[in-house]
Amino acid sequence: MADLFAILVVAILVVFSFDFFNGFHDAANAIATIVATKVLTPTKAVAMAAAGNFVGMVFITNAIAETIGKGIIDTNVLGVNALPLSDAALFHSLAIIMGGVVGAIAWDIITWLWGLPTSSSHALIGGLIGASALAAGTGSILLPSTTNMLLFLFVTGMAFVLGAASYFAYDVIIRRHRPTLGMTILAGLLTGLLPAVILGKILLKGLVQIVVYMVAAPLVGLAFAFGLALVVIRLFRRHTPTKVNHEFKRLQLVSSFFYSVTHGTNDAQKGMGIITLILVVAAIGPPWGPPSGQFAVPFWVILGAHASISLGTFFGGWRIVRTMSQRVTHLRPWQGFSAETGGGIALASSALAGIPVSTTHVIASAIMGVGATKRLSAVRWGVARRIFWAWIITIPASAGVGMAAYAIMRLAFGV
């Protein structure tokens, strides 16, 4: 059986590598809009985004790290209820955790090579679910009760129907237009958004809660960006386009940095949660680990995770920047400001609530929301559909890769 200390060191380095790939793959989204508006060159934008990711560690909350560490799979599968573990049990627990992380990294690399703006966050969740399900069955995946699930579906479903029907009636009776199916569905989704966000936090948990917020977070980003863009249009309607662009070029520097900070605090916490879980399972206490019985992230883990994601941002992601900034919609500085501010608000809210969401989804939807203020045809929906299908397959595909990675880890660890 392999040396325990060496395995722990390698496991922690692998998680930091995940954060690096997260930055390489996901954090480019933070600069997509500021590159599209030509406020900054790609090189300067990447440097600013990397700095913002690192500054994200001052956002004092570890709620997402706790959700990742103990809110997706049953930690009893990892032996948390029977510490300290024997070497064999510890190696098996590490095989599950590392299977999930390695599966997520593999999926990140695959989608980066394809140029798809998929989600590292959901790849990690899928990898953990796949590894845990293969190791201990689907019962190891945390799910809400049937009663809570049905209540959630009933309330949000009624809100969706009410919103869609109201929009349909408004378009037919008041505007005397023929309503489009897409806008009718979108109206229903936006109406159901508030009850979904509130009830999702109260009634749901585990995988179902994450899937709900996987849909809700982009809609929040879209709604905030769309609304903010409409406010900007209203306030600056008497100004010349040249003056508006000049003013918002400076403001977009602030909004882009704000988005980078919220991205850093949101995404770095995924790696922080995994490393803290490793320390808990290995029964490593202070100063390197959390106190017994607590899920407290050590400062060195916070520092290392943010440094890793910042370095990843600095070194890559250009193909995805091109997809996000040039092929979704064309942007002006005021639109970039609206998209980044709306997306940043959505990410900051999710960080405070402890909900792991996809920064990729949020900024893509925010860009589409801003583009839709001009006209729906201004958004290149073909690219949006491609991104949408990439979202849909991320969790199941990365779960499959996580299963394979777990099997390989068991062989490597000799358990």
State where each predicted segment sits.
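Multi-pass alpha-helical transmembrane bundle typical of ion/small-solute transporters
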Residues: 1-415
